[in-house]
Amino acid sequence: MSALFYIVLGLTIAVGGLKTWDAIWSFRAQTLADYAEADTPALKDVLGRTFQAEGVIYDFTGRVKSRFNARIVGAFDDAGGTLNEEFVYASGAVDRREWSIRFLPDGQSFTATAPDVIGEGEGKITGDAIRMTYRLQLPERAGGHVLNVVDWLYLLP
């Protein structure tokens, strides 16, 4: 057999191995089903208050790009409400975002919009975890890129 065949075979095995590793053992492998054993509280009870959050932003390779603290103030009724966030990053930069959130009939899912979000974000609570996906338009000072964001929020006592 030719050397080219073995090179292609080796690359195929390597790529397949990396994809398997990523799907099974990386932080991207988690799903909401992983948190289903805990009781699922009502979204308005979880989000409809003032709370503090700490977070980490990862790049596409899984490396930490930034850390932040956030103050989050929610005001909700049975249909939805607003979530005001103020982020203070390790660099000292400050960002603010106001989400408009609409609860869906299943009681666990929601849609969300914000001025710097393209279209609608989608979220769901299961057990003590909330997962939300959306497309974020970065400000020009940060390059103006559009990011596909997957936010995980973990509820602590």
Go through each PLM region and give its residues.
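Amphipathic/hydrophobic helical signal segments and adjacent flexible N-terminal regions
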Residues: 1-63
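Central antiparallel beta-sheet cores of small beta-barrel/beta-sandwich binding domains
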Residues: 47, 53-154
